[in-house]
Amino acid sequence: EIAGLIGPNGAGKTTVFNLLTSVYQPTHGTILLDGKDIHGMSTAQINHAGIARTFQNIRLFSNLTVEENITVAMGPQIKYGLASSILHLPPYRWEERVAHERAMELLSIFHMEDMANAQAGSLPYGAQRRLEILRALATNPSLLLLDEPAAGMNPSETAELTDNILAIRDTFKIAVLLIEHDMNLVMNICEGIAVLNFGKLI
């Protein structure tokens, strides 16, 4: 399912995302993910539990390649030890190959395979946005939070993003919650919409 969270600036939309990802801790109440209380978990534990997100302002490792930006998100899933890493033993080589194949698989969703070796900071704005989404997907989430994914995009890039988000839902069978001010995008892809104002649902 794709759901939208809309409302005016300052309504508390990003605060909701920050609460869901444990950037902020709620003063009372509980936060449930698949029936499990995730209140009090660290951001790493939240990610391990199945929540991944993007940000209003793009956060990439600009000096790393596109592929490296994706594989770095797979770190918690990698199972080789320090010795294997230093000596490049078979477990290291196998895990690195798996990470490479997974990164290329993700890049193929957005038709970005030919950008794998490009420096992330050199990508066009729209491609950087898509890369941030792919990096979040690399953590294998069950819930993907997209914070204004179309911000700064031109109509052509927004149309492409719309197709990308639908492809994510259909390919990964995950829930997507997005904050967005582009009402055309919201109306075109969201199956449910919640409106937030002054921190309250209306």
Where are these regions (language model features)?
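Glycine-rich phosphate-binding loops of nucleotide-dependent enzymes
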Residues: 1-202
